[in-house]
Amino acid sequence: MNIKSSQDLVNEANQSIETLNSIKVKSLVKNNECILIDIRDIRELWKEGTVKNSKHIPRGMLEFWLDPQSSYFKESLDLNKKIILYCALGMRSALATKSLVDMGYKNVAHVNGGFDTLKQSGLEVIKKERK
């Protein structure tokens, strides 16, 4: 049985999606030109925090929450803005970005290096409270 590795899938995704560095993302966030979406598991947010004003959409729900035909669709998101996804290191967000491109989204990208690089860029990180 020949199975592709997860790294192979990430590498393939990265060849067909837009990848942004944290400095560019910081500029887009500062100018309110994007929706920054944290796709990490909620436990990661509780432990490490999240970028202030980012939206949390768990990776497992992303396609459903961004599908206008789905009962899970989040109408509150301004989908006219650039959508930028991030995870911890940039692998899950690469796969998720590829999925949104496959759905037909054009103005979507992900963060190279993920949450760690966003923190290093100076974007404000806030604590995510447990409900």
For each predicted feature, which ranges?
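Active-site flanking residues adjacent to catalytic metal/cofactor-binding acidic residues
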Residues: I37
